[in-house]
Amino acid sequence: MADNISTGILSGLYEKVYNPDVLSCLANLSNDEVFTPPEIVNKMLDMLPQELFSSPDTKFLDPAVKTGVYLREIAKRLIKGLEAVIPDRQQRIDHIFKNQLYGIAITELTSLLSRRSLYCSKYANSAFSVTHFENSDGNIRFKRIHHSFDKSGRCIFCGASETQYDRGEEREYYAYEWIHTLHPEEIFGMKFDVIISNPPYQLSDEGNGASAKPIYQYFVETAKNLKPRFLTMIIPARWYAGGKGLDEFRKTMLEDKRIVRIVDYVNAKDCFSSINLGGGICYFLWDRDNPNKCQYTNIHDSVVSTETRTLNEFPVFVRYNEAISIIHKVISQKERTVSEVVGSRNPFGLSSFERGTKEPQEIKLFSSGGTGYIPVDDIPQLSLIHISEPTRPEPISY
């Protein structure tokens, strides 16, 4: 009976019954190079004005191509969106792939993988490519870049250690072209309407996890400097707290009114099920021409909360939308806050090792070692202490 079923029917049945997306099945190489699930890619694309996909002039760039999933999903939307503009399907595909989609691969391996995803061939000039280029790269380039080390042994662009990344030609340098040039605009020599990516997150500094050096901020900053109409990237959410070289990045991001959308996953596994990334993950939309308050969505423990907020409203970034109304209520009471009477470290100029003496003095000192005494003259920052009676100063807690 099976012999009587045509190959076409079997093929059609297979497509309907089982048609997995291979890019959703790939394992991540490491926490440095995280592959983006197609579902997340499309959520990011949904944030963009959809008319971008109906214009034959919109140019898209992924400056950190891994699997090619961003360019592939954009191509799908353009092929559908330009149907009325360029009716002939092959002409439409040729135009889109040659004039609208561009990428910079992060390694030689990912350049081959991404061309296979987009062009159906790892070489864009092969007979198997869905559109023919004169060169093997097509519009997905990979250029082997060396780090530029200074006298201290650190790369001037990304801070990589010379002892760890000054390697032989047989190994990857992880010197990504997008952030290892003074003139990224010259890579393709054109302006882009949309820059979209999931950049490498960190470089190992002979530690791992939280101790590794973050580099994703350099991809964001470089993209901003090129002033595309829209920028969207998915990055670790650790920048909310700063530290590890992220303080200035945190400040500029929270102050940037062009960050009009953030989707925040407190647990990174809700977004990338196969990685362990402390601090969560987020993706954002930067809109060059329409600065506004940010529509911020927080996702934790299956709870989804969205509020339109000013990101730098408080000195500390408040991650949970549910806390905003509580903070406003507390502030409205105009009462003295704990921060006015509690110091994080050495608030009176006293060392944390100070225990005082057992002999009674003017000031009582409470510490982890018990109760001691200290003369008034031995307190460097006496002005911080409220003395109600000159002869009997109030005791202080330390």
Language model features with spans:
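Intrinsic-disorder/low-complexity loop/linker signature
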Residues: 138-139, 301-302, 371
